[in-house]
């Protein structure tokens, strides 16, 4: 009985860290991709992309074309003009190259650089919500702003000297 209590307490202490903690360390440049599904509004998409660029650039993170790591913002909208509520999903993910542990140790042993890189998710956060059709764009924009703020906050936690 005592062993179970000790094991539970020990596992809770060790599992409190966020899985993406320190994954944004030394991140200085990214590419940006915006995917909108459910609404075809090129002007709004362009406005969102410009907003995202400005939010990232104001923190001195350089945006390059066709670069890895890639910051992907996925927006899925179900706009119901018939029903009172519409639904949306906004996801922000950072993808970069990685290598499996087995291949890493093999490349060290062989002193060769491996070419078997994988694309992995290094950071991810998302929001699901509901809104009226009249407030849908505004609520999606608020959600995007909240996710970008979370990303920037984590970036500063992983790169504390960038604040100065």
Regions found by a protein language model. Give the residues of each.
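A structural "domain/chain start" motif
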Residues: 5, 10-54, 153, 157-164
